[in-house]
Amino acid sequence: MPSWDGQVRPIGDGSTSDSGPQPGQVPGEKLAPGQKPPQFVVFSWDGALENDDHLFSRFRRVARENNAQMTFFLTSIYLVPNAKRQLYHPPQHAPGEAAISFPTDDHLKETLHEVGEAWRDGHEIGTHFNGHFCEAKGGGEWSVDEWRSEIEQAYSFVANWKTNTGYKDLPPLPFDFRKELAGGRAPCLEGQKNLLAAAKGYGWRYDASSPGEFQVWPGRKDGIWNFPLQLLPYPGRPVQVLSMDFNFLANQSGDSTEGDPRKYAGWLKETRDGYLNGFERVYNGSRAPLFIGNHFETWNGGIYMQAVEDVMKSVCRRDGVRCVSFRQLADWLDAQDPKVLERLRQLDPAQSPDWASFLK
């Protein structure tokens, strides 16, 4: 790679910039024969708005304290002022429509700051696309061309926030989003088939939109790494639960994000134990990467955020564990012998082989 000369170069209208290689990145290393694989854990965040709850800044701090890097799937309309919402032309919907709120001006500025600092901390900025449309007329019903339009707008709102907001005095984001963006997660995990067909043209390396699979080593779909939410053992029940805050919520208080406060402590333990069950199963077993998905939310008194913080503190500094971003995991997988990955994919989650002979 050419060495960086230390000059920050603005791109386009100055919304983004080339500020050199991202800090904190290490190249993927090939496993040696007989070597036990690292235990990768990927924490990811859908939306990534910094609002009055200050969860983006909180989890940047937690990550820093626990040697973790993560993936933030930015919803690009969080960089579009409400007054300019007509700039968004969603597939199958009227201009300016969205299933989520556009940001306040203060939240937009705070989100810009957090996104820039997250990148400098070594975290990945992925995409959660724009309007968060689900079900009828949502991503699951979009054509390949409609997904392309959604992707192009996701790029554009990040690359042109200065023009769209008029905030010319704020510093640029420290990365080129066209080069930075390596994958995303579709709202409601809908539409992966056509999304993948669209994503290929952008050189994306992974997709995290699968509606859920077992805790096994990842493979590729259409040449793109498939990083699904995973089924984890639910504490005290003979069922499994998808590895995301929303799915624990659905099992605990159903449709309500404000359930019975008397149950919060028990639900917090249940959620934390659910994530840790999934971790222990593979840490002591197949070493398949663990994927935990979240939103910045305060459901049921904030218990899901506390559960994730507790899990990060519990696992990220353990021996052999690497809490990484999805792109960092893709780097590592790309560095491996495909035959080795094929062998790893044969393992059940709790199956712990004799590594010295299994990967010789």
What is each of the regions a protein language model found here?
Residues 123, 127-128, 227-230:
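Aromatic- and acid-rich polysaccharide-binding/catalytic face
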Residues 1-17:
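Short glycine- and acidic-rich boundary segments immediately preceding or forming the N-terminal edge
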